Amino acid sequence: MDITFTIFAQSLAFAALIWIVATKIWPPLIKVIEERQQKIAEGLAAADLGQKELAQAQEEIKKTLKNAHKKANEIIEQAHARAHQIIEAAKAEAIAETNRQQNLAQVEIEAAAKRAREELRKHVSILAVNGAEKLLKREIDVNTHKMLLDELAAEI
C-alpha cells in the first residue's frame, strides 16, 4: 500500500468522523449545553430576584417595626395620660368628698353647739327661776341674798 492511499483513506475516515460527529453527536451536545446555560441563567436571575425580594422584605420589616414601635409609644403615652386623668379625677373627687364631709361635720358641730346653748339657756333659766323662787320665799336680807347667789353660782 501506498502512502498516498493510506493518507487518502485516513483523510476519508477523518472526514467521515467529522461528518458523523457534526450531524449525530454535536447537535445533542450543543442542545444539552444550551439547556444547561439556560438553567444556570434562570437560576442566577431567580437568585437576583430573591435577593431583591429579600431586601424589600427586610425594608418592609424595618418600616413595620418602626410603625409598631411608634404605635406602642403612642399607646403608652395615652395610657399615661389616661392614668393622669384618672388620678386627677380621683383627687378632685376626694377633695369634693372631704369638703362635703367637712361641711356636714361643721353643720353637725353648729347644730350640737346650738343644742348645747339651748340646753344651757333652759338650765340657766330654770336656775334663775329656782333662784328667784328661793329669794321670794325668804325674806330678803343681805346675808340670805348673798348665800343664794353663791348657791346659784355653784350650780352653774
From Swiss-Prot:
Keywords: ATP synthesis, Cell inner membrane, Cell membrane, CF(0), Hydrogen ion transport, Ion transport, Membrane, Transmembrane, Transmembrane helix, Transport. It is a single-pass membrane protein. One of its GO terms (molecular function) is proton-transporting ATP synthase activity, rotational mechanism. The keyword Coiled coil does not apply. It comes from the Bacteria. InterPro entries: ATP_synth_B-like_membr_sf, ATP_synth_b/b'su_bac/chlpt, ATP_synth_F0_bsu_bac, ATP_synthase_B_chain. The chain crosses the membrane at residues 3-23. SUPFAM superfamilies: F1F0 ATP synthase subunit B, membrane domain. Its main location: membrane. It is found in: Cell inner membrane. GO terms for cellular component: plasma membrane; proton-transporting ATP synthase complex. PANTHER family: ATP SYNTHASE SUBUNIT B, ATP SYNTHASE SUBUNIT B', CHLOROPLASTIC. F-type ATPases have 2 components, F(1) - the catalytic core - and F(0) - the membrane proton channel. F(1) has five subunits: alpha(3), beta(3), gamma(1), delta(1), epsilon(1). F(0) has three main subunits: a(1), b(2) and c(10-14). The alpha and beta chains form an alternating ring which encloses part of the gamma chain. F(1) is attached to F(0) by a central stalk formed by the gamma and epsilon chains, while a peripheral stalk is formed by the delta and b chains. Belongs to the ATPase B chain family. F(1)F(0) ATP synthase produces ATP from ADP in the presence of a proton or sodium gradient. F-type ATPases consist of two structural domains, F(1) containing the extramembraneous catalytic core and F(0) containing the membrane proton channel, linked together by a central stalk and a peripheral stalk. During catalysis, ATP synthesis in the catalytic domain of F(1) is coupled via a rotary mechanism of the central stalk subunits to proton translocation. This is ATP synthase subunit b. The lineage of its organism: Bacteria, Pseudomonadati, Pseudomonadota, Gammaproteobacteria, Lysobacterales. The gene is atpF.
